[in-house]
């Protein structure tokens, strides 16, 4: 049978029929260890890197790498012994890091391909029961990881496809490499400048991802497909960029937002691991330079240095790859540091937990003070209870280990949310859990599922120094006010006039409200806590313009009648009735970035006329944030407007709203009319339009639904129905958990409709829902799978893949 070229693969992928399933025995062997006396550690029934089966990690890695190397070295009987043992016994890969177990699974597949003449049905059966489900689950959950994960997963997919001669699986691997909505796809991992998605993280992971992409290209080349050439030799640019930086040269760098939205704060190349060269550069060099005659000057220089290192015996034979250090290149100094701030005397502390932090490379643990906050936690049976939780805050760079010791009770399990962030809870004993952070997060540590006394962890990059902030204020012609660490009553909070920068030293606690009123050009920065005892308004912004609030922990912070307001690294926790977290009333150009809300009413709202503020609400954006609604909605749009205000003849508009990269940890609202994590309810003659929900992850709905989009007349709060809702997009919204309550889209009448609602990439428990999804009975509506009720006076609802 005639096989298709890559050009036809790309144009007519569905028609691939046969492949030249071969493996070059000339592939360089990474390790030169003598395997003739190797003793197998396994086989293991379950392989994992974390959790219950984590003890299988090292042994399974050694075994599967040994099988590949021995097959290449001609030690066929010993390779077959390992292959057959795992083919008979291995059932699955387990744990959060199961996709990374496909590193060794790839080695095993390559060994099996070399030894295919001795294959048995058990080989393919093992691949299909253990490897392919792990690949499928990763794709169902994607995108959520840095790109080396996706590249590693896809490398194993291609190796498995070649091993078992599955042309459809091979086609999927090529499609993923070129087009996947994951950081592990070539165009999402390597930019047109050569910068990699993980360049800003560190060089070990960037080279790991590049190496996996090179392996994919090598396997495809063995089948006659030239993935090296994809996107105008894009991978060559990534290899050259990496070689250039790791040899000590400067490189261009641009902060970008990756497809997960999680890894977008790196503003320079990651210096960790710089100059520690992984043996990944020879394969691409031989292809691009040796075969195609292209130029790779930095890679050429790197390989020349590598040969010298080999002659001097300076190359370390690692399990995953050989490595060596480039002479004269050192890691940067901006590495692992942690910054903790003692609580001031008089601040409300809580002693349920002892929390310790340790930067990577240090032997010392530092205790972090634990504050108390009240929440209105759900306790089941349509009930809530005011309870006390704990929270800590610290800053760090690089990596930091966190140890949490439960002082008052024993526990069996620990969960660290958002789940999507992938923070692994390593339970040390019945009172201690430990985990690693490699970038700042806002997290909830929950023991045995308890959310009534959990621990919140707020972390950030270190704030700007007092001296630098003062210099900036002076250059801007602003007044600079510095508040030193301490506990402050309401009367100690200064007035904040226009053209003021207020710097709160870490370790400041306030029991009053920072009132920004009728002002412009105001900044509150540093690290402070402002939590009045009644539970409302640690800060508010009224009738003001050009305002920045950065690094403040508070209860609530409404913004009314204002323009150009930014809240960054603000954390809101509330417990009383009507305890909305971050409300917007009749304001425009409001940005929320990296905020956290756990509130006793709506976490964030966008209203028009309300609370004495008149007018429309426009250009509201929230990104990179975490929302937890103990009551009501995480996001609520549109209810209030001019009909209930002093000028009921006016028509307000709520428009141009973007919510992106949001984790929603809870909705617990028993009243059906107030459910919907993503809720739009046009009232008071409002027109709500141009709304985008993008990359939203929802988990743990106690009582609630995914969405409500309505035009309604709620007589409790409104004087009239809304005018309508139009042009709303739900893009890459994902829910994982038990069956949610019924979502609703419903208009009011023929003059007050819902129009043009688009769903793109909607996933419910890993299943992508769209109008053409396979297996959907023709008589089913796509909405039934959510479940979603589409009522009357609704036009143009579409579900796209």
Predicted regions and their residues:
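Extracellular beta-rich repeat passengers
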Residues: 669-801
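Extracellular glycan-targeting catalytic surfaces
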Residues: 25-143, 151, 155, 178, ...
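Hydrophobic/aromatic side-chain positions at a characteristic register within alpha-helices
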Residues: 71, 161-165
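Acidic/His metal-coordination segments adjacent to aromatic residues that form catalytic metal sites
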Residues: 86-93, 134-140, 183-203
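Right-handed parallel beta-helix
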Residues: 499-501, 506, 520-531, 545-555, ...
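Extracellular "leader-to-stem" segments immediately downstream of a signal peptide or signal-anchor
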Residues: 23-26, 329-498, 511, 518-520, ...
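Extracellular beta-strand-rich solenoid/capping regions of secreted or surface-exposed proteins
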Residues: 435-437, 488-501, 509-525, 531-549, ...
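Bacterial Sec-dependent N-terminal signal peptides
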Residues: 1-26, 31
């Amino acid at each position: 049978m005639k096989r298709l070229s890559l050009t036809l693969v790309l144009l007519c992928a569905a028609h691939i029929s046969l492949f030249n399933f071969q493996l070059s025995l000339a592939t360089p062997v990474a390790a030169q260890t003598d395997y003739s006396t190797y003793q197998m550690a396994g086989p293991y029934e379950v392989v994992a890197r974390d959790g219950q089966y984590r003890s299988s990690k090292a042994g399974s890695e050694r075994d599967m790498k040994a099988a590949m190397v021995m097959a290449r070295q001609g030690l066929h009987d010993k390779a077959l012994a390992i292959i057959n043992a795992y083919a008979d016994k291995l059932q699955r890969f387990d744990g959060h890091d199961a996709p990374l177990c496909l590193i060794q699974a790839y080695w095993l597949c390559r060994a099996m391909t070399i030894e295919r003449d001795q294959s048995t049905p058990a080989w393919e059966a093992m691949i299909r029961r253990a490897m392919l489900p792990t690949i499928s689950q990763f794709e169902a959950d994607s995108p959520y990881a840095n790109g080396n994960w996706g590249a590693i997963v896809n490398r194993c997919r291609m190796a498995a496809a070649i091993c078992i001669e599955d042309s459809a699986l091979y086609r999927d691997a090529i499609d993923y490499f070129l087009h996947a909505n994951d950081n592990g796809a070539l165009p999402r991992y390597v930019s047109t400048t050569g910068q990699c998605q993980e360049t800003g993280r560190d060089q070990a992971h960037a080279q790991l991802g590049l190496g996996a992409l090179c392996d994919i290209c090598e396997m495809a080349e063995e089948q006659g497909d030239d993935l090296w050439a994809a996107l105008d030799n894009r991978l060559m640019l990534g290899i050259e960029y990496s070689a250039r930086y790791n040899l000590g040269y400067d490189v261009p760098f641009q902060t970008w937002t990756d497809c997960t939205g999680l890894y977008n704060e790196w503003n320079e190349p990651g210096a960790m691991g710089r100059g520690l060269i992984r043996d990944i550069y020879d394969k691409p060099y031989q292809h691009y330079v040796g075969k195609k005659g292209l130029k790779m000057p930095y890679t050429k220089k790197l390989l020349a240095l590598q040969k010298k290192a080999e002659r001097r015996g300076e190359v370390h034979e690692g399990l995953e790859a050989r490595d060596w250090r480039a002479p004269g290149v050192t890691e940067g100094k901006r590495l692992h540091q942690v910054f903790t701030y003692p609580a001031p005397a008089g601040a409300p502390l809580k002693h349920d937990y002892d929390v310790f932090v340790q930067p990577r490379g240090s032997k010392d643990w530092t205790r972090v003070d634990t504050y108390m906050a009240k929440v209105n936690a759900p306790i089941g049976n349509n009930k809530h209870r005011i309870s006390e939780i704990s929270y800590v805050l610290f800053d760090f760079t690089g990596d930091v280990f966190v140890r949490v010791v439960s002082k008052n009770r024993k526990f069996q399990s620990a969960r660290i949310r958002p789940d999507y962030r992938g923070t692994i809870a390593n339970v040390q004993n019945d009172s201690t859990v430990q985990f690693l952070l490699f970038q700042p997060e806002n997290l909830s540590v929950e023991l045995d599922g308890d959310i009534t006394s959990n621990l919140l962890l707020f972390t950030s990059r270190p704030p700007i120094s007092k001296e630098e902030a003062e210099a900036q204020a002076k250059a801007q012609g602003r007044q600079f006010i510095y508040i030193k660490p301490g506990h402050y009553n309401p009367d100690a909070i200064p007035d904040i006039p226009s053209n003021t920068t207020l710097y709160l030293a870490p370790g400041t606690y306030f029991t009053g409200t920072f009132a920004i009123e009728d002002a412009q050009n105001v900044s509150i920065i540093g690290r402070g806590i402002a939590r009045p005892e009644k539970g409302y308004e640690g800060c508010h912004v009224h009738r003001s313009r050009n305002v920045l609030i950065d690094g403040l922990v508070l209860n609530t912070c409404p913004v009314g009648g204002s323009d150009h307001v930014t809240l960054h690294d603000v954390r809101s926790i509330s417990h009383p009735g009507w305890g909305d977290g971050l409300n917007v009333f009749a304001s425009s150009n409001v940005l929320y970035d990296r905020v956290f809300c756990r509130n006793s009413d709506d976490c964030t709202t966008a209203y028009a006329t309300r609370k004495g503020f008149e007018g429309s609400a426009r250009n509201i954006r929230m990104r990179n944030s975490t929302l937890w609604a103990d009551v009501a909605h995480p996001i609520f749009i549109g209810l209030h407007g001019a009909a209930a205000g002093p000028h009921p003849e006016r028509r307000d508009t709520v428009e141009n709203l973007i919510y992106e990269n949001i984790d929603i940890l809870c909705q617990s609202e028993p009243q059906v009319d107030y459910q919907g994590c993503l809720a739009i309810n046009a009232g008071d003659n409002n027109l709500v339009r141009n709304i985008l929900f993008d990359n939203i992850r929802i988990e743990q709905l106690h009582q609630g639904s995914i969405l409500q989009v309505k035009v309604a007349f709620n007589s409790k709060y409104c004087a009239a129905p809304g005018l309508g809702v139009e042009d709303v997009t739900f893009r890459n919204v994902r829910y994982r958990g038990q069956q949610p309550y019924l979502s609703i889209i419903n208009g009011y009448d023929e003059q007050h409709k819902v129009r043009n609602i688009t769903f793109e990439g909607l996933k419910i428990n890993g299943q992508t829902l769209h109008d053409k999804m396979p297996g959907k009975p023709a008589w089913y509506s796509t909405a039934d799978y959510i479940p979603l009720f589409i009522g009357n006076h609704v036009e143009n609802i579409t579900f796209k893949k």
